[in-house]
Amino acid sequence: RETMENLLLTIDPGTVDWSRAQFALTAIYHWLFVPLTLGLAVIMGIMETCYYRTRKEFWRSAAQFWQRLFGINFAMGVATGIILEFEFGTNWSNYSWFVGDIFGAPLAIEGILAFFMESTFVAIMFFGWSKVSAGFHLASTWLTGLGATLSAWWILVANAWMQYPIGCTFNPETMRNEMTSFFDVALSPFAIDKFTHTVTSAWVLGAAFTVGVSCWYLLRKRHVELAKQSIKIGSIVGLVASLLAASTGHESAYMVAQTQPMKLAAMEALYEGGNSQSLTGIAMVNPFSQPDYMNESEPPMRVAVPNMLSILATKSTTGYVPGVRDIIKGYTKADGTKEPSLKEKQERGKRAIQALKDYRAGKDKETNKKILDSDMKYFGYGYIKDANQLVPYIPINFWAFRTMVGLGCLFILVFALMLFILYRKDITRPRWLQYLGLALIPLAYIASESGWLVAEFGRQPWTIQDMLPTWAAVSDLSSGGIAFTFFLFLVLFTAMLTVEISIMCKQIKKGPAL
């Protein structure tokens, strides 16, 4: 491969759009299963711990009930996850070539270490109740959850590297980015923040699912004791996890402000930045338009919390937060350094692209290598032709962020209310609360998917931040072929989801063997 120029000259825009749509479809369906796996792992681990300590048959039956639901969901998550990983090679081969040496490492570790670990212990967890000691079985249950969490860690390390690429260098001889520090990649601050926020939010979803199913039992006046104990454990886990998710979300917002300021500007619909910026609670942001951002006015009817955006982005009430136009024009950071304008980044990106061509052609390699070392971090900007290409779709980012945060606050209130009524009153009586608990299940999924919409829409147009735009990362495939597989996957995934929901509902209706 000489450069990406030939691909960019011949690529069908439909190929890019359908490739993105197919990957988004697979990721959305996959993420319906993953957070419930992570969340239920904690719930069933706690219940089996109660059985191990008390040896009461009630806790054994309760743990086995939630483990059955965990197992159904786990199987679906594995199936969709395998398809998701294969799409990097089929639809995004240019990306795989460009950074495969780095991106492939955490995925390989996830498959070899974490997945095999959870696969081994999940078998003991399901089939070892009467074959191994109670202590070994308890350890297997917790290790299954740990394995699932480690899988999430390595996947999120890979995703975080795409949004904050560190620990690597570009080799013009091979036309590939190569890892220079595994620990920089694996332990980057972006990866740590993404992991803690994602996993704690998954615990919230698992707790919401537990409380929701238990409230359904209360509405039907079935398995009341299981429902009460499950609501107790689910609400405690949910409240703690919700508070942790809020805290880690604050840290994630701070990291985004430092590394992806355009994403933060899109989340806030902030066109003109400044000091002491307020955080918008709600504003009239048109959900159907993609305006000319250099001339767009601020959204009307903005209701905001004073100074809160500056606190999130800079941890200071007076901190400077750049808006869309500031980022495009260039601005001065808090540490006094100058962030180059889009025009300067484009020039340096084009210079890097030309230097790479000349290097590959054997022209003055030493000089061109120095240019690449200096300007490679702006390589992707050489493919940006218009300022509006640099701005992610603001309406989706704006509303998805508020949906996530608003529901997160609601979860804190509902879990706290559940615990209050559980300890002070009879939770089997207020039916409105039981319906509210049941509603937590879809609301938790909406919040979880909204968070990923912010993360992935917000980093556009980049596949790898500042290095590789989305349209330069795709495979040279026909848009018609990708469209066909998109609808094929849509039917397949919908059928899988329908089957899972059907099996889960049957198991829930059947209830525990008490």
Give the location of each predicted region.
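Membrane-interface interhelical loops and short amphipathic "cap" helices
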Residues: M4-I28, R55-A62, F86-A108, A160-T196, ...
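Hydrophobic alpha-helical transmembrane segments
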Residues: V34-I43, L113-F121, A202-V213, T403-L419, ...
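Membrane-interfacial loop-to-helix junctions in multi-pass inner-membrane proteins
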Residues: T54-I72, F98-G104, A108, G128-L146, ...
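Hydrophobic alpha-helical membrane-insertion segments
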Residues: G71-T80, W142-P165, G238-G249, Y359, ...
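Membrane-interface helix-loop-helix modules in multi-pass inner-membrane proteins
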Residues: N73-L143, A160, F457-P461
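Internal alpha-helical transmembrane segments
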Residues: A123-K131, F136-W142, W153-M162, F182, ...
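Aromatic-rich transmembrane-lumenal/periplasmic boundary elements in polytopic membrane proteins
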Residues: A158, V240-E347
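C-terminal substrate/ligand-recognition segments
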Residues: Q389-W452, A483-Q507
